[in-house]
Amino acid sequence: STIIKPDEGEVNIAGYDLKKNSLNCKKNIGVVTQEIALYNEFSAYDNLLFWGSMYKIPGKELKERIDETLDLFGLTDRKNDKVKTYSGGMKRRINIGTALLHRPKILFMDEPTVGIDPQSRNLIFEVIEKLHKGGMTIVYTTHYMEEAERLCNRIGIIDNGKIIAQGTLDEL
């Protein structure tokens, strides 16, 4: 996700070399952290507005993308409520939404369904499947093998920081 500089090999993101053009690489990456990265005193709408402005999305376009995001995650009716009143699953959905506002080509997701209700989990799965069908590359970390089986067309198993196996589900 460009936080740590590579020490060997090559990384190209959306046609940009990470070492030579990290800014354009970053513009094409979305990151969903395991910890919720929202302001509890803000509404969902205001959180999306804040993060969208950080991506420098112009006003009218940003408002349209916020409305699309709220609709995608089924939170339009609660858009003006403070995030602190949301369930864990609702917070997760908005958290993912903040990483999608700038329409990245690659999305890194770290344990996006930890500790949430089944309805939110299924909605997140549906969104991930829709994004993938739309051409987005998703790097998904999980400890839940059934999630990897459902969502991933390639799987890597990491132990002590090293990839010990990788391939399709059938290959593994």
Residue spans for each PLM region:
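Conserved catalytic motifs of ABC-family nucleotide-binding domains
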Residues: 103
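Conserved ABC transporter NBD signature motif
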Residues: 9-17, 25
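Conserved ABC ATPase "signature" region
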Residues: 49, 53, 60-78
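Catalytic Walker B motif of ABC-type/P-loop ATPase nucleotide-binding domains
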Residues: 107-110
